[in-house]
């Protein structure tokens, strides 16, 4: 059995649900009270996949301009990005559009796996950002698009498993390390709506 750490950054505007998604993934519970962070925070969880052990680290940044320089350093060593926005606040999708620029200039490679995550899918009746607009943004930047709810737990674990498989395919197979995925796995694409 081999062991690998996968570092996934989870940027998003304050209040978009990044902390709730991270906690739902790591602890499988929803925490109502939001706390302010200083700098950067992460959660981790061990996942067994194809007779190998992966530690998935979800890193989220403080939503404070003073710490942007610190946060951007973490982009260089990341394997992927879950860019989170809430459809209930238009400014959160604008934040993602700006964040794309930082990712492209600070990530170690342009081939990092990037997903656009619509959080709070349980609040769709309060939409300010249509599903069609979100899908258009994801296509414009070459991101895969997913919806989830940290409150209900809908799709949170599935999204992390999908990005894990995509990272393995992009990074490990690019190093000719074919033992992680079979042909069947390569044909199994994640699509969650």
Regions found by a protein language model. Give the residues of each.
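TRAFAC-class small GTPase G-domain
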Residues: 1-175, 193
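Polybasic, Ser/Thr-rich amphipathic helices
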Residues: 182-193
């Amino acid at each position: 059995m081999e062991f690998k750490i996968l570092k996934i950054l989870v940027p998003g505007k304050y209040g978009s649900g990044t902390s709730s998604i991270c906690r739902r993934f790591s602890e499988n519970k929803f925490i109502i009270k939001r706390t302010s962070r200083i700098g950067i925070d992460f959660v981790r969880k061990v996942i067994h996949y194809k007779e190998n052990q992966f530690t998935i680290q979800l890193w989220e940044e403080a939503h404070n301009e003073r710490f942007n320089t610190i946060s951007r350093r973490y982009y260089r060593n990341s394997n992927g990005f879950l860019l989170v926005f809430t459809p209930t606040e238009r400014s959160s999708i604008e934040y993602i559009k700006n964040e794309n620029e930082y990712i492209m200039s600070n990530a170690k490679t342009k081939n990092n796996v990037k997903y656009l995550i619509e959080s709070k899918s349980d609040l769709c009746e309060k939409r300010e950002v249509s599903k069609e607009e979100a899908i258009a943004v994801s296509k414009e930047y070459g991101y895969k698009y997913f919806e989830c709810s940290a409150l209900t737990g809908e799709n949170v674990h599935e999204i992390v498993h999908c990005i894990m498989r995509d990272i393995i395919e992009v990074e490990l197979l690019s190093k000719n390390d074919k033992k992680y995925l079979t042909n069947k796995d390569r044909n199994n694409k994640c699509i969650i709506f």
